[in-house]
Amino acid sequence: MTYNIILAKSALELIPEEIKNKIRKSRVYKYDILDSNYHYKAMEKLKDKEMRGRPDIIHISLLNILDSPINHEKKLNIYIHTYDDKVLKINPETRLPRNYFRFLGVMEKVLKGERNHLIKMEEKTLEDLLNEINAKKIAIMTKTGKLTHPKLLKEYDTFIIGGFPYGKLKINKEKVFGDIKEISIYNKGLMAWTVCGIICYSLSF
């Protein structure tokens, strides 16, 4: 069986036009990708600022996913759905840079529309993506969901993990054909990359 793993509403985006004039590039950070560590002041009045500007979450999560046994067995479809409704389909054989800044360089090119044979980008909503991949049993990972033992994760074919630091993932369930359940794998909140690791490990064995 092949599973789908989606980092949703991910805090990975180009610097929004409305704050571009407030940001100056430096020797340390020369990328056009929003990062709250470097753009905190410019983001003060940005809508949903608490959810945005954390590409490091996506970087670490992808490193965990790509190096998992289930991915090496080619039984995983990997998607990044971004805050501004772009979807990146990650080829399972992608060798992602381990260096954060090199990762930003790759993602900046992809988000600007440069062709990459391992990372394909399209514009679509999360709901459209779920219907397109024919997701039937969908698990939204949330700390307030039904506590579920990791060994039961194989009952689902699609897993949605919030790719942002704070806030709640909103999804219009009426627009999704598949059955959606909110579940939790621990009684406290976990970082996205930890959740990704647990899911991938549980599906591998």
Swiss-Prot record:
Catalytic reaction annotation:
pseudouridine(914) in M. jannaschii 16S rRNA + S-adenosyl-L-methionine = N(1)-methylpseudouridine(914) in M. jannaschii 16S rRNA + S-adenosyl-L-homocysteine + H(+)
Site feature Stabilizes Arg-54, where:
D56
Q: Name one GO biological process term.
A: rRNA base methylation
EC number(s) from the headed UniProt entry: 2.1.1.-
Q: Which Gene3D superfamilies match?
A: 3.40.1280.10
Q: Which CDD domains match?
A: Nep1-like (cd18088)
Residues annotated for S-adenosyl-L-methionine binding in this entry: M141, T142, K143, G162, G167, I185, Y186, N187, K188, G189, L190
Q: Which GO terms describe its molecular function?
A: protein homodimerization activity; rRNA (pseudouridine) methyltransferase activity; rRNA binding
Q: Which UniProt keywords apply?
A: Methyltransferase, Ribosome biogenesis, RNA-binding, rRNA processing, rRNA-binding, S-adenosyl-L-methionine, Transferase
Where does the entry annotate site (Interaction with substrate rRNA)? R54, R95, R98, R102
Q: Which Pfam families match?
A: EMG1 (PF03587)
Return the broad EC class: transferase
**InterPro entries the record matches:** Alpha/beta_knot_MTases, Rbsml_bgen_MeTrfase_EMG1/NEP1, Ribosome_NEP1_arc, tRNA_m1G_MTases_N
Q: Quaternary arrangement and interactors, per the entry? A: Homodimer.
What exactly does this protein do?
Answer: Methyltransferase involved in ribosomal biogenesis. Specifically catalyzes the N1-methylation of pseudouridine at position 914 (Psi914) in 16S rRNA. Is not able to methylate uridine at this position.
The entry assigns this protein to a family as follows:
Belongs to the class IV-like SAM-binding methyltransferase superfamily. RNA methyltransferase NEP1 family.
Q: What is this protein called?
A: Ribosomal RNA small subunit methyltransferase Nep1
- This protein's gene is called nep1
